[in-house]
């Protein structure tokens, strides 16, 4: 079911945690959101683009724009489907518990899984709650694989980097930066150009 919407790449991530200080350093000190690159003065640059996201995480890299905004109709639609989602935004733990207790892999399960994927990986908010901004993209599950999730991840990461001085918090998929750097650093200086092509 998850693979049917082209999100199977997220099931193959073997990394349960990331080095927080290192990831924050890459995000705050090295990532240039305007150029969409990790910049290391005197050593080179590593492009971080929607194509990078597609190659690393195998998510959809073409299609329509992912709507990530507060939409009353979408909020009402999602709340009407789940007893646990009423009033304020549900906690991530609540949705995870709902998934654990689910007896069938149906649309409700898939929608809940996507809420978790977006709120913990693709575009984690600064709180421990599911952001209702993700609801518009999840109302019609048949359209999920027709959206450009790679572009969405990059746009959210770049937006977070631009606003980093205004908010004392880090959001966005910084694991992308860690993996991009790791792929680059595993190559020797002799394959500098090849390492850039990988990304």
Which sequence ranges carry the predicted segments?
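Long, internal protein-protein interaction and assembly surfaces
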Residues: 35, 45, 62-63, 83-199
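N-terminal leader regions that mediate targeting or early regulatory function
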Residues: 1-107, 114
């Amino acid at each position: 079911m998850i693979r049917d919407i082209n999100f199977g790449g997220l099931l193959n991530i073997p990394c349960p945690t990331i080095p927080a200080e290192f990831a924050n350093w890459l995000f705050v000190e090295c990532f240039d959101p305007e150029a969409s690159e990790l910049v290391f003065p005197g050593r080179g640059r590593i492009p971080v683009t929607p194509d990078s996201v597609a190659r690393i995480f195998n998510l959809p890299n073409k299609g329509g724009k992912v709507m990530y905004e507060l939409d009353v109709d979408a909020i009402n639609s999602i709340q009407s489907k789940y007893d646990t989602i009423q009033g304020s935004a549900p906690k991530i733990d609540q949705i995870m518990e709902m998934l654990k207790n689910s007896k069938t892999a149906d649309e409700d399960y898939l929608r809940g899984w996507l809420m978790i994927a977006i709120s913990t990986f693709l575009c984690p908010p600064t709180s421990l709650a599911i952001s209702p901004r993700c609801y518009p993209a999840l109302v019609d599950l048949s359209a999920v694989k027709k959206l450009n999730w790679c572009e969405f991840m990059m746009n959210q990461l770049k937006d977070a980097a631009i606003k980093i001085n205004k908010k004392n918090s880090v959001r966005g998929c910084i694991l992308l930066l860690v993996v991009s750097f790791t792929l680059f650093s595993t190559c020797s200086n002799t394959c500098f150009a090849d390492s850039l092509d990988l990304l």
